[in-house]
Amino acid sequence: MAIDVKAIEEHIRGILIALGDNPEREGLKNTPKRVAKMYEEVFKGMCYSNDEIAEMFNVTFEDDLCINDNENDMVFMKEIEIFSHCEHHLALMYNMKVAIAYIPKKKIIGLSKIARIADMVGRRLQLQERIGSDIAEILQKITDSEDVAVIIEGEHGCMTTRGIKKPGTKTITTTLRGKFNTDPIVSNKLMMLYTK
C-alpha cells in the first residue's frame, strides 16, 4: 500500500482552514506539503504487512555456533529507541525504549535487523501493546523460534500533553511468547537482564 501524499496535502490544507487559519499566509504556504512528506516518512511502516517486514529483514545465520548446547541461551537487546503514533489521537508516542529477546533455534538474525524491525513496526498508527506483538510475530517468522519476548517502555502524548496531562508518565508493556511465558527460569533471566 502506498501513502497518498497528495490526499494528505489536501486534507492538511482543509484542517488549517478548519482551525481558522489561512493556508496561503507566508508561514503556512508549504505546510501541507511538508506535513504530507513527514507523514510519508513517519508512517512508512503502514506500507508493509508483518509478513513483508519479515521478508525484508530476513537475514539469518545458520553457523554452528553451539546455540543448541543449551536450549535456554538467549539473544537479548535493550534500549532500542523508536517512536510511534497513537491510533486514537495521532499523538506521538516517544522516549520509547524496546528490549527484545529470543532463544535461537538453529539460526540467528543479524542484530541490526532486530532494531530495524522495531523501527519499522513503530512507523505505523499503533498501540504500544500491538508494537510488541507485531515485533514478536515478525521475529518468530524469521528465526523459527517460538521463544520471543518484547518489553517496551514509552511516553504517550495523548496522556502527557492532553486530557489528564501527566508529563513523565511511562507505560510499560510486555509480550512474552513460548518459554518466556511458561518457564520461570527463562522469564527470571529475562527480567534480570532487563533491569541490569
Swiss-Prot record:
One of its GO terms (molecular function) is GTP binding. Zn(2+) binds at residues 86, 89, 158. One of its GO terms (cellular component) is cytoplasm. Belongs to the GTP cyclohydrolase I family. InterPro entries: GTP-CH-I_C/QueF, GTP-CH-I_N, GTP_CycHdrlase_I, GTP_CycHdrlase_I_CS, GTP_CycHdrlase_I_dom. Its EC number is 3.5.4.16. Keywords: GTP-binding, Hydrolase, Metal-binding, Nucleotide-binding, One-carbon metabolism, Zinc. This is GTP cyclohydrolase 1. Toroid-shaped homodecamer, composed of two pentamers of five dimers. It comes from the Bacteria. It comes from Clostridium botulinum (strain Hall / ATCC 3502 / NCTC 13319 / Type A). One of its GO terms (biological process) is one-carbon metabolic process. Pathway: Cofactor biosynthesis; 7,8-dihydroneopterin triphosphate biosynthesis; 7,8-dihydroneopterin triphosphate from GTP: step 1/1.
